[in-house]
């Protein structure tokens, strides 16, 4: 059997498993199994028809073309005393997208029409916009990336075009049956795409990549990768969250063409329409929720995996950001992630050494917490207290009156995402890079409580006040004292190039079993030394001229091949945040006194037990 037919067979098997999930989760189909055909017809006929036209992709692998028009409904509504949401004064509408796709079925070339090429000129840095709102105005929300902005060497330098998704307003599949159908359609679309790609290759031969390497399997062609990304953007919820996690992986884990396609999922989800938004507001805040506000903007500032953010003004005049959760996502975490796992397994996208099952387990736990906005509100208040005396950081106020388990309202604050700071002068970039690393070390080794989502939009820099505004604490978590003790010792061993110390602490932490081959141990130690480089020498470490990411990438394949066990659960979130801090410094091209910052923490740290420490040193850092 040829390789393409084997791949196709694997995906067909995966689609059948998803179809089984539809059956297991659908109460209507359970009625049919019990012989209640009349109940099946009356309760689910119309629902199934509507759901089938509101989901990701088609079984033919083609997309419905969306027609964009200007909505007749206003974007911003104002509430007077005693008014309800149907009695409002409207401002001119900003933008809206037709909530219903046209029935025209278009060729797969239309896949390209879901995206646009934008050219960002670096001398127009004040014009970065997110959903029609200037990025500098956004505070308390996760900004949707407006394209990669690189450092400008001159005012006339033009950044290469960046491929971006065109925003769409579409209902969130919110019932178990609708979400299961969505995954079924997505899997079928991938299968059809694989058939077309395989047919093309049988006739024309396997295409080659720009570096003269054979292209990916027909199952994971560029077009199929884009289908996967678009499907996840429409499903939202845990499905999109997993896609976003994959999008920030290294090329040693996920092939570059797939990463390029998954970049679309980082640009934001499809937008939830007003018809779904109002019922959530009614259910969470009461049918008179508008009495608590002066105005509410239905045009979202941002749309993410679990919810979307809207600007509003409270009765006391405070501008706020209201994060509103998509309906159904909290109850579909388990099934969503299992369906994504099936698709990933049957597309062979994830290498064996990644220990997908363990990663999925951790993802389920993290997502369950992120879907509870009451937990996030507590975490945000805790961070606000912890950082209240730390210069250079600000955590916005939580507004309890308009917050609930599925709605989080916080003070709206201004700033630009950290990656856009790359457009500013070197002194500012060095300052921001230093503050980012200072925060990361303090979170882990002082607070033992860390916000683990490294999304650059979660850190908004206010140049006027030289303050980094911190938002989105859904992924905040505590770390056990013993784990932090040993992790600090391991970091110091890496900085001191102490091979025995790295191996010993890695075994104590659970990164190694003690039965690894010499090849694996050597790769693990060398990777640790590379990560420890910024902390190895006094003075400033120039992240611009030292590419840590590419150096580790060269060792990634070896470690994946020879790894015997998954890392400890704490490592998934921790390393996501640590790598994010390093990548931010690389993006900024910052020079940071990393060793001094580490020693400042290390020399004040109180270990619960005192084995031989890798180093005893003094700090030369200035306050």
Curated annotation (Swiss-Prot):
Record bears the keyword Amino-acid biosynthesis: no
Reported tissue expression: Expressed in stems, leaves, buds and flowers.
GO molecular function, one term: transferase activity
Active-site residues (renumbered): 453
Enzyme class (EC, first level): transferase
GO BP annotation list: chlorophyll catabolic process; cytochrome complex assembly; response to UV-B; ubiquinone biosynthetic process
Protein kinase domain span: 295-583
InterPro entries referenced in this protein's UniProt entry, alphabetically: ABC1_dom (IPR004147), ADCK3_dom (IPR034646), Atypical_kinase_ADCK (IPR051409), Kinase-like_dom_sf (IPR011009)
Chief site of localization: mitochondrion
Induction context: Strongly induced by UV-B.
GO cellular component: mitochondrial inner membrane; mitochondrion
EC number: 2.7.-.-
Coiled coil: none
Membrane topology: Peripheral membrane protein
Pathway, per record: Cofactor biosynthesis; ubiquinone biosynthesis
Chain positions covered by the region annotation Disordered: 152-173
Assigned keywords, A-Z: ATP-binding, Membrane, Mitochondrion, Mitochondrion inner membrane, Nucleotide-binding, Transferase, Ubiquinone biosynthesis
Family stated for the protein in its record: Belongs to the protein kinase superfamily. ADCK protein kinase family.
Protein name: Protein ABC transporter 1, mitochondrial
Protein species of origin: Arabidopsis thaliana
